[in-house]
Amino acid sequence: MRVWAVANQKGGVGKTTSSIALAGLLAEAGKRVVVVDLDPHGSMTSYFGYDPDSLEHSNYDLFLHKGSVPQGLPGQLLLSTSDERISLLPSSTALATLERQSPGQSGLGLVIAKSLAQLWQDFDYAIIDSPPLLGVLMVNALAASQQLVIPVQTEHLAVKGLERMVNTLAMINRSRKQALPFSIVPTLFDRRTQASMHTLRVLRDKFPEEIWQGYIPVDTRLRDASRAGVTPSQFDGKSRGVLAYRALLKHLLAQQLVAQVA
């Protein structure tokens, strides 16, 4: 199983949409995908019609065992989605309490990695929707992953947030055997605005090697898919947003192949 994290230390950049869009396209290609909602706000969980405040069980259960994960527990927590090839490991608001509980508890940074290790025979891909704050949850997402997607909204405050994320990644990489490859993905691009055009140029100038040369445009069909509770490609496989995500997926698969060869 390949594990991808979608993360940025800034909210509202399209993390959840990107996670679900990529999962939907992988499922369309016949892959089995587990999507992991690690954001206490539960946007991914809500997307598929579940209420993070009322779920009896969630991935918070995985963190209740001081770093060990009981055999079989991850599989018991999985929920169905709009696509039979996509399963959801849901979030709950209780995840927000982990940051207060985590000091002094060893092993909490590897809970998701250990959980996904139990599911590797059942899925081809795992996609983790990370919270926007650096803490035990983001550390879990990055520690479990072999590849990182960093969505960046094309607006003037985005570059600062991206720089913080890149610095965080450098810190995480010091404890990894291999550096985590990443792709910067410009999102919510609107060619009609100077802000989008300027930010895209700045991102390409500052991160020429790391940035994907395409972009995800503003597309109301992506919002409509969310309202319908289905993946963007299920809702409208030929929308501008989905076509952009198809190109992004092709780029990520090529990057994955390079990493595997290396």
Question: Residues of each region from the PLM?
Answer:
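P-loop NTP-binding core
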Residues: 1-262
